[in-house]
Amino acid sequence: MGQPGFTPPGFLALTIIEKQTPDLTIPCLKTPERSILYGDTSSKRDPRTYLNNVFSLYDYFRKEFYAPKEGQKRAKPEVPLVINTPGWVKGNGYDALVEMLRYIAPTHMVQVRISTESKNLPAGVFWLEEDQELSVSLIEIASARRDAYNRSVTIRKDASLIRDLKIFAYFRQCFPSDFSVDTFKELAQALIAHRPYVVPISKIKVKHLHCQVKHFERAETLLVVYMSTDVFVLVPSSEIFYALNGSIVGLAVSSAKNSDSEHATPWCVGLAIVRGIDVSKGIFYVLTPVPLSILEKVDLFLQGLLQIPTRLLQVPGCLSPYMSTNVLLQS
């Protein structure tokens, strides 16, 4: 979710791989079969929602690729499911991983282990109950990197840069493949010049993924409560759009929920940058590579904690459109 394989950061996604990816060292994006926007790069803020999203994706996979359809005597040929588990494996992260593995019940488990034993997960089928017996193939791989004493070492990657590159690759899709956009500077300039889509404000509802927004009766004030913290903020209703402007939002169709729960987050069809808001005309201006035919069905913006990379806000000779003071227009 922090550095997912085939989507921008913040997503939990089910992606169908039909051919080998030639080079995993560069960002490779694929349109997922189904995706849910968690809206953050770590599950620490809300592990329960994270797990529910994982379970929804897994249930969808079982239903679509294993269960027989109406009129079929047996299910489709089995499609293998490879799960990239989270890297947070201490404390609550470990508990979440155990719950995930018990729900999914994998047939194979691959662990990459290093010489610092305290950083490894327990050996064996650590997630099973004591009286539970399941046939699981365990595969352990030693780290390929070793020091002068033949001890495995970890190579720290710049996670922030990897996330920025994924966002770069995603919004690069706003332009034709033969369009010359190879650097953050070029993409920033191209996005500034790109004509945005117009989306009526009246059509859109906003779902805040990691805070609760409540309206006070007889008052033009909103109470914003940040989940998993004790922080709350009072925001005038007239200024609530400032939280959306210049942000990355998920695009969703409210009727396309991933479960029957009224609190379930609908499937996400893509991301957009809110380029500007004209309050007097009731219009959002958004930049997105999502096709117009899909965008026309969108009636829900999902606001998480994803940030526009700083490199896309810095264009020499231009005032960043996402940080201007006059982007909210009122009559």
Model features per residue range: what roles?
Residues 1-186:
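Intrinsically disordered, low-complexity, Ser/Thr/Glu/Asp/Lys/Arg-enriched terminal regions and linkers
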Residues 41-46, 110-331:
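Preference for solvent-exposed, low-hydrophobicity sequence contexts
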